């Protein structure tokens, strides 16, 4: 076998003309030799990392993420596996797309993956991470989460707001009756319902159109922009030297504007509450802001929070309680309209339990509505409000399923793909609520086949609050009305296109015609 070095030496000695060529070839050979040696040296290290698709310089795998990230990641993970390592710019990103892998992250190694990645969007809109959802894992997060779990979203507190949910559902039913036989924008109605419930529970009054005057109209617009921005990606978070783009594309200016408008609005509401702080009454009738201001005054509470923390927590209630809740309602009704068999079965259950009562169905009536709960679970399986959940981040190096995961790796858990896994569900793309009858699977974070609200330390603390709104609203609208699509369209004609962003609701509003049943 020829020795390349000997060949080069012979060429060098044979002719002075060939000397430059010899040195060039030698240099190329040495570079190739070093590259080969380096790659073989690190083969063992690389083999212990999760599988990765090829990436580009600077942007990494960002070019492979389309308009619908959860769908793009599904296609990639089908080729590379349920634990897949990507790079968004310079940031390592672990994509988790199976129930088994999610269990490893959210249960076995939950503490390691309990942090949140930094985000320019969250930093500016949520008071520099002073809320619960985006706060870094640590003592502050433990304190404010404890406030939410024990004081705002406990079972007793959620029950205490039952009258608010029933009253606002009754108002929605009246509005539907007033427009019966006409085309209704159900998406808009669900947005208003959830906004009104959250406003009354969190702030003590409604701020919807016609209720809060000019301030109500402005708040509705600001809240819409707030939700849109939470689902926006700032490229500078992944490619730092492109941070200047937010000043060119207007994102930075829009963030500053919306953050200031929200802050001004909440400051006004806080001042109104403080001016009436002497008001007495049953503790169960106090709104969230009343409770937070009272905790702020209690120096003996052991959980000191300042005014900024109060505002951050209140904003969390809107971020988690409006867009995600109305999205679940919207998709449930969409699937019912697409599947008349399921709609009829649900109506038969509800009407069989409640009868011909014309007043609003109450939460006491929901206890025996097992098919209603199955419809809700099936909706969340196919349409989790946040398909990739809120990202997590590893705090240290850790081994997961034999792979080495480095500290500061972002983690995206695809609740959307897990819910469509054919290994877990028969005919996963079909809407069949019967699969959840008598099988015990729930959405509260213990069953990793269904985790629309996450699991572990960072599980959404408002699950019970959100589902209480969903169930009473859905039960009432299928009980009181028969439904049809406009222009005698069939269920197959419904456009199922999703929006892009943090939550995935329908891109086009859901419109239907209601016919009073009684």
Swiss-Prot record:
How does the protein associate with the membrane? Single-pass membrane protein
Instruction: Identify its protein family.
Output: Belongs to the cytochrome P450 family.
Record-given protein name: Cytochrome P450 736A117
This chain's source organism reads Prunus mume (Japanese apricot)
InterPro entries from the entry? Cyt_P450, Cyt_P450_CS, Cyt_P450_E_grp-I, Cyt_P450_sf
Asked if the keyword Iron belongs to this entry, the reply reads yes
UniProt xrefs under Pfam families: p450
Q: Which cofactor does it need?
A: heme
Q: Where does heme bind?
A: 460
Q: Which residues cross the membrane?
A: 17-37
Q: Which residues are glycosylated?
A: 12, 185, 275, 356
Its chief place of residence is membrane
**Gene3D superfamilies, per the entry:** Cytochrome P450 (1.10.630.10)
Q: Which GO terms describe its cellular component?
A: membrane
Compartments in which it is found: Membrane
A Gene Ontology molecular function term for this protein is: iron ion binding
UniProtKB keywords: Glycoprotein, Heme, Iron, Membrane, Metal-binding, Monooxygenase, Oxidoreductase, Transmembrane, Transmembrane helix
**Iron recorded as keyword:** yes
């Amino acid at each position: 076998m020829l020795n390349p070095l000997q060949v080069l030496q012979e060429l060098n000695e044979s002719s002075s003309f060939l000397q430059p060529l010899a040195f060039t070839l030698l240099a190329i050979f040495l570079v190739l030799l070093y590259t080969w040696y380096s790659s073989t040296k690190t083969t063992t290290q690389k083999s212990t990392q999760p599988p990765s698709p090829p990436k580009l310089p600077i942007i990494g795998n960002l070019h492979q993420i389309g308009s619908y990230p959860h769908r793009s990641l599904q296609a990639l993970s089908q080729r590379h596996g349920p634990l897949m390592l990507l790079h968004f710019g310079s940031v390592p990103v672990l994509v988790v797309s199976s129930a088994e892998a999610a269990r490893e992250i959210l249960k076995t190694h939950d503490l390691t993956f309990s942090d949140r990645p930094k985000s320019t969007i969250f930093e500016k809109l949520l008071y520099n991470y002073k809320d619960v959802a985006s706060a870094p894992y640590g003592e502050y997060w433990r304190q404010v989460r404890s406030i939410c779990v024990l004081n705002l979203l406990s079972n007793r507190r959620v029950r205490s707001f039952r009258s608010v949910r029933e009253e606002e559902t009754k108002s929605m039913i009246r509005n539907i009756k007033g427009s019966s036989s006409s085309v209704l924008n159900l998406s808009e109605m669900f947005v208003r319902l959830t906004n009104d419930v959250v406003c009354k529970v969190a702030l003590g009054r409604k701020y919807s159109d016609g209720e809060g005057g000019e301030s109500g109209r402005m708040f509705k617009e600001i809240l819409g922009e707030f939700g849109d921005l939470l689902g926006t990606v700032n490229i500078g978070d992944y490619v730092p030297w492109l941070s200047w783009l937010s000043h060119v594309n207007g994102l930075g200016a829009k963030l500053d504007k919306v953050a200031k408008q929200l802050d001004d609005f909440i400051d006004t509401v806080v001042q109104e509450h403080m001016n009436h702080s002497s008001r007495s009454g049953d503790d169960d009738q106090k709104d969230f802001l009343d409770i937070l201001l009272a905790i702020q005054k209690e120096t003996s509470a052991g959980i000191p929070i300042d005014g900024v923390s109060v505002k951050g927590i209140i904003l969390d209630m809107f971020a988690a309680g409006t867009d995600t809740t109305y999205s679940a309602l919207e998709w449930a009704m969409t699937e019912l309209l697409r599947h008349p068999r399921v709609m009829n079965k649900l109506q038969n259950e509800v009407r069989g339990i409640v009868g011909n009562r014309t007043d609003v169905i109450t939460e006491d009536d929901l206890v025996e509505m097992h098919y209603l709960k199955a419809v809700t679970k099936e909706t969340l399986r196919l349409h989790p409000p946040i398909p990739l959940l809120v990202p997590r981040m590893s705090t240290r190096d850790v081994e997961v399923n034999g792979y080495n995961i480095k500290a500061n790796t972002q983690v995206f858990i695809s609740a959307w793909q897990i819910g469509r896994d054919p290994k877990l569900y028969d005919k996963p793309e079909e809407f069949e609520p019967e699969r959840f009858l008598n099988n015990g699977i729930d959405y509260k974070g213990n069953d990793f086949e269904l985790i629309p609200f996450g699991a572990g330390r960072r599980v959404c603390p408002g699950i019970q609050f959100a589902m209480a709104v969903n169930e009473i609203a859905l039960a009432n609208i299928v009980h009181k009305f028969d439904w049809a699509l406009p222009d005698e369209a069939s269920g197959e004609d419904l456009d199922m296109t999703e929006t892009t962003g943090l939550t995935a609701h329908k891109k086009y509003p859901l419109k239907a015609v209601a016919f009073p049943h009684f």
